[in-house]
Amino acid sequence: MADKIRYGVTLYSYSNEYVNGILSFEEILRTVKAQGYTGIELVASQMVPGYPYPSDEWLAQLKALLEEIGLEPVCWSAYIDMGIRSDRDLTEDEIIQFTVNDLICAKKAGFPMVRTQHAISPKIFRKMIPFCKQLDMKLTIEMHHPHHPEVPVWKELIEIMRG
């Protein structure tokens, strides 16, 4: 049935099993499929070896494994580590570089969308549009407490999203 609702799950839901070695990454994917989910959100900083710079080989293996299992890669969740340096926060250019890197990695693994965090300012979000178009990728932003759609920064982000 073409209009049947499909269910996806964030692999963050399996954090305990993964972090404590109860299930391997592949076992989690197979469990997700066995539980009836069709799509996944991958929290890259948690489950991608070498993140934020995973190997092309690993990304290709992930894509092949998802195809083999029959899971749809829906969302690559990025993490902008503003504290990666001890002497300062990331610059605007560094945030852009990290975000472009996530878009490229997600694309290689077959994910059509990257979800990033609210460390992306409206100014940076606007600057990401050409990269998204070039890569044919979507960039979304996590709305996190205490934010909501009526917060001024979110009003501006939503306007950018509307084009």
Task: Report the location of each language-model feature.
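Histidine-acidic metal/acid-base catalytic patches
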Residues: 1-38, 63, 67, 96, ...
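Hydrophobic faces of well-ordered beta-strands that scaffold small-molecule active sites
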Residues: 5-12, 40-42, 73-78, 114-116, ...
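A short acidic, helix-capping loop that chelates divalent metal ions and anchors anionic groups
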Residues: 16-18, 46-50, 82-88
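Glycine-rich anion/phosphate-binding loops
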Residues: 23-24, 52-60, 87-100
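Catalytic domains of carbohydrate-active enzymes, especially glycoside hydrolases
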Residues: 24-45, 104-112
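Glycine-rich, proline-tolerant flexible connector loops at the mouths of alpha/beta enzymes
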Residues: 41-67
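Residue-level "edge-of-site" marker
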Residues: 45, 50, 78-79, 119, ...
